[in-house]
A protein has these predicted regions:
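C-terminal catalytic/acceptor-binding lobe
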Residues: 176-256
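Short beta-strand-to-loop acidic/aromatic patch adjacent to the donor-nucleotide binding site
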Residues: 85-96
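Active-site-proximal specificity loops/subdomain of glycosyltransferases
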Residues: 35-86
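Short, high-confidence coil segments that cap the C-terminus of an alpha-helix
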Residues: 83-85, 113-116, 200
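A conserved hydrophobic helix/loop-capping motif in glycosyltransferases and polysaccharide synthases
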Residues: 2-11
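Short loop->beta transition adjacent to catalytic acidic/histidine clusters or analogous donor-positioning motifs
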Residues: 1-2, 23-33, 50
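Conserved catalytic core of nucleotide-sugar-dependent glycosyltransferases
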Residues: 96-192
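Short, well-formed alpha-helical segments that are part of the catalytic scaffolds
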Residues: 11-25
Length: 256
């Protein structure tokens, strides 16, 4: 079973439309919602499998945004529900699956990899000129956190991956759930590095599948561009920021 956890701050009607779309496209998948918007908007969301994320670490400067509370709350949610997934997938609200077999391809890819964690651009960033690594390579709090838990020969090794689209085996999620991850550290560095030092194996989606070829930082995808792309059967796209066009996009995907 795959649990797919979505992070959103959008208005309630937008969130409910997205969760209905996902449930229709992937009926064999179990969905939940981590909501980081206003509490009063959270209360308006009709989708029942939701949890509120009030942690300030979700907000603030991009290089210090920490989504650990979302990952940990997802683990707490499925345990409360008595659900035992073997895989957990984490996407932001601007990540749009485009095919009904998207989740099957997620499973096929991680099984082909043999890894515990897959992410976009997932790699060892140590001694590279990658921006997030340069920002954190001498960060005493991060390095102390990693050294305290590391089973690796080099506790200063730093891994990174795009926060959107992370796919983990349940054992990896469980290893993060009851751990103090409250550092002011970017998710894209903190989560992969923590899992690496705990002894888990990490890999890059693109090494085993084309499922994330439609995932990028920028520019955002536009509806007209997706009209041309969808006949070529891409698996997903990120980022799609045009909230007003989401209903039309959902219709386009579901009728193909």
């Amino acid at each position: 079973m795959i649990v797919h956890s979505v992070l959103s701050h959008h208005p309630a009607h937008v969130v409910d439309a997205m969760m209905r779309f996902l449930g229709t496209l992937g009926p064999q998948t179990v969905f939940c919602l981590g909501y980081g918007g206003p509490r009063e908007e959270f209360d308006r969301i009709a989708f029942p499998e939701k949890f509120f994320l009030g942690d300030p670490s979700l907000r603030g400067r991009i290089e210090e945004q920490n989504f650990s509370c979302w990952i940990q709350a997802t683990g707490a949610w499925y345990r409360r529900r008595g659900i035992e997934p073997d895989l957990v997938h984490f996407t932001e609200n601007d990540h749009i699956p485009l095919r009904a077999d998207y989740w099957e391809e997620l499973r096929r890819t991680i099984e082909a990899s043999g890894r515990d964690f897959l992410g976009k651009w997932c790699m060892d960033r140590t001694n590279t000129n990658e921006q997030s690594y340069l920002h954190y390579r001498d960060d005493a709090r991060l390095l102390g956190h990693l050294a305290a838990l590391s089973v690796r020969s080099d506790p200063r090794t730093i891994w990174g991956a795009l926060a959107d689209g992370m796919l983990m085996r349940r054992t990896a999620v469980e290893a993060l759930t009851n751990r103090d991850l409250s550092l002011p550290c970017f998710t894209e560095i903190l989560i992969p590095s923590t899992l690496h030092h705990l002894g888990f194996t990490l890999g890059d989606f693109d090494a085993w599948s084309g499922i994330f070829r439609g995932v990028r930082h920028r520019p955002a995808f536009a509806l007209d561009g997706l009209r041309e792309m969808i006949p070529t059967k891409p698996w997903c796209c990120h980022p799609f920021k045009d909230v007003g066009s989401l209903p039309e996009l959902y219709e386009l995907i579901l009728r193909k």
